[in-house]
From Swiss-Prot:
The active site is at R307. This is Probable pectate lyase 1. Pathway: Glycan metabolism; pectin degradation; 2-dehydro-3-deoxy-D-gluconate from pectin: step 2/5. It catalyses: Eliminative cleavage of (1->4)-alpha-D-galacturonan to give oligosaccharides with 4-deoxy-alpha-D-galact-4-enuronosyl groups at their non-reducing ends. InterPro entries: AmbAllergen, Pec_lyase, Pectin_lyas_fold, Pectin_lyase_fold/virulence, PEL. Residues 1-20 form the signal peptide. GO terms for molecular function: metal ion binding; pectate lyase activity.
Amino acid sequence: MAVLPTWLLAMMCLLFFVGAMENTTHDNISSLPRSDETEWNQHAVTNPDEVADEVLALTEMSVRNHTERRKLGYFTCGTGNPIDDCWRCDPNWHKNRKRLADCGIGFGRNAIGGRDGRFYVVTDPRDDNPVNPRPGTLRHAVIQDRPLWIVFKRDMVIQLKQELIVNSFKTIDGRGANVHIANGGCITIQFVTNVIVHGLHIHDCKPTGNAMVRSSETHFGWRTMADGDAISIFGSSHVWIDHNSLSHCADGLVDAVMGSTAITISNNHLTHHNEVMLLGHSDSYMRDKAMQVTIAYNHFGVGLIQRMPRCRHGYFHVVNNDYTHWEMYAIGGSANPTINSQGNRYAAPKNPFAKEVTKRVDTPASHWKGWNWRSEGDLLQNGAYFTSSGAAASGSYARASSLSAKSSSLVGHITSDAGALPCRRGRQCSS
């Protein structure tokens, strides 16, 4: 019997090993295909100020319509919140759920989620097998390779054994049911596009990992430890996080890293957490320069400490949010992010050493004085103050638009229904 050469035996063993590992790839940044810089940045807009102006214009129009109708004595369900005014007034919202996909604003306005797909009804709250999930479960829905609009048959508490890895073109729509994702793994949006997460209670998320988890119909892989974020956005684009109630997680409530962009985070109620929102991977990760995020109409509520958000490199439009509590600071950053704060209400805590809204993290003033951090039309209460820098601080910044953030006095009203709404069929969706 002929003896095969050693080099040939080694090659055969290698090929066998690669084939065996086809479905068990280590799902980290090094194992996934790299894009060139043009592809990576293709979802970022060239003039982010134009997108910010569009948000202001939509808000101004909604506020004006709401105010004028009330003056004329008409009942109106309008709130001055252009997202909500787009769909919430319809008592038959449940018959036209996909209308929501046309209501986005800001950098994530083009996120269509599963609009062009069929409905998938989650009937089973269990999560027995993260590699081979049973039909009817949320995990089985989100891994499908086709667009889906995911809804829930009834109220349920879903305790995930591992992080829930969401595939592209998915909407998770909790309206009409009281849906909690809690006490286990939570949501990961990794290297995908067009995802909408709406109407969920996400809390008490735990670190998970060192396990196999399925991410699509055709792929599962070994996952290292996840941090325990409520929602983790990783290298993804066209993502909209709207009307969720988020609290008590091991790491962040919403984190977006590794070049994620075209994101809107809106109408959420965030409470009881330390490091709330991280936007940007690290000071040395240059691809986060393309990160563009709109943070609008959220209520940053009781029990929050810092990072609302904490930004790196990109462009961040913080508009018409209600900051009623923080313990250290509200908005922080490093690595020269642009922060455009407009029409927010900042109510400082009683602590005399925590009145400043802003914090430049581990950076001397000689560096951050050139960063473009600007405050326009913000309502500063209880001694709160915003330290501007860059062109805004020097007085040389001039808006190309005549728009201004005029609605800070109405922020309490605009954000009064932030968080997951108790929607019921046949009624307008309101708290």
